[in-house]
Amino acid sequence: MRAAYASSINPDNPLAGLTVGDIDPHTPEEWATVHVRASALNHHDLWSLRGVGLGADRLPMVLGCDAAGVDEDGNEVVVHAVIGGSDGAAAEGVDETMDPGRTLLSEKYPGTLAERVRVPRHNLVPKPPELTFEEAACLPTAWLTAYRMLRVRGRLPDGGSVLVQGAGGGVATAAVVLGVAMGARVYATSRDPGKRERIAALGATAFEPGARLPERVDVVIEMVGAPTFDHSLKCAKQGGRIVVSGATAGYQAAVDLRRVYFLQLEILGSTMGTREELAALLSLCVSHGVRPVVDTVFGFSEVERAFARLESGDVFGKLVLDHSR
């Protein structure tokens, strides 16, 4: 089948290892097959091409974590990318993100940037008819991560407030949209004036990084890392929560522990989300009329262009692949 896959590892020039062509990857025969209609790119794909989380001994590896498509029974489905346990098994109601043996698609098992993807049947979530395949394909990684950060780890209260650091990328943009949909007062930072305008259009109040906010917030969504972490601590109210799911600009952050203990702040890690949380996210999108922010929809034949766009960093929202063209 035709797929976009990592054929080599290159930390300095990740796109040098991207190959588009025919491949016949091995997956467990008992898993469900999904004919992919749309997929979406994530920075995880670039990190894989750099060799982070993907060793040379696992090459070639089909890339991609996000997909929506049709299973062998004709059902329209969204693929949950977290594969739990040593054999991909996951029990109902179990938080598979806490499984020490968990992997994401494209780390141990072939990913979604292909004509077909196989996953445990547990990983299939019904796609609501209100969402297009392109919209649904945006949700399983970045949007699910943002949902868990806000609702589960951050425990965002009704009528609460949230700061999103470094808005513009997939997770941060999702956090802005979801925070607004949840009824929160949303503040977001970006160095780019154009992105600040687009953040404001989504319903948030935009600031330059490091700016003083009108209030201290219940929840801070932190993915930038070292350059913004002190600001995140200063912006959290007493008993507030700083939820971290990335450190794109540096992972060695200085922390004023006096602020942490005196204000009884919580610093919480968050990674992806469960199948049940993905189902809840889909329901929220339908009930609140929420739709993912899509930067560009490329045809699958343009996958190299899509990756180049992702690497450039000049993206606001998700990059989507339409597998019909």
PLM regions with names:
Residues 81-166:
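NAD(P)H dinucleotide-binding glycine-rich loop of Rossmann-like/cofactor-binding domains
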Residues 26, 71-72, 206-214, 302:
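Short acidic low-complexity segments
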Residues 129, 135-210:
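Mid-domain Rossmann-like dinucleotide-binding core that forms the NAD(H)/NADP(H) cofactor-binding site
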Residues 24-40, 52-93, 97, 101, ...:
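Glycine-rich beta-strand-centered segment in the early N-terminal region that forms part
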